[in-house]
Amino acid sequence: MAEEELYKRYAAKVNALCRRYLADTDEANDLTLEVLVRALRKISTFNYSGKGSLAAWISRIAINMSINHLRRRRLQMVPLDFLSKDKIPEPADEDMATVPEELLESWIAGLTDLRRTVFNLYSLDGYSHQEIGRMLGISERASISALAKARKQLKENIRQYLKDQGL
């Protein structure tokens, strides 16, 4: 009974989180089930702290398990160049509105594991580079570098798309 309710309420959100970290949909689907099973097993450790706290707790489990899954796959470390101060200007907000969300998601999924993970943790989940470094076992500088490279790659994809669209 509790399993069904947990699945109905949180499976879609957990799956979306897992897909952000894992480029493979099948892996994300498998991990979604593992996250929900772990949440059920560990529910006695959950401390209610107001509306949304269960969702936040389950999201944290999903993020941690996604990162651990990537670690097990042996994250390929990107050689540390100096911070890439790319010269590609940020796309205008009105131009960004024309880029389909599915396309952005596919570009993010196409990043290397390290770049995608750092991008998600920093840009979407709000972690600092110091926190990301601790979570992934890399230096703060490596986190900054991976984010810069991810952003550069995404900006290049966006620029090319906008150019192809005549914008």
Residue ranges and their predicted role:
Residues A16, D30-V37, G52-N64:
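Structural recognition of an alpha-helix C-terminal capping motif at a helix-to-coil junction
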Residues R20-A23, L36-K51, R72-R74:
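Sigma70-family region 2
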Residues A109, D113-T117, D125-A142:
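Helix-turn-helix DNA-binding module
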Residues M1-A16:
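A short, charge-rich alpha-helical start-of-domain segment used by transcription regulators
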Residues I67, R115, L136-K163:
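DNA-recognition helix of helix-turn-helix
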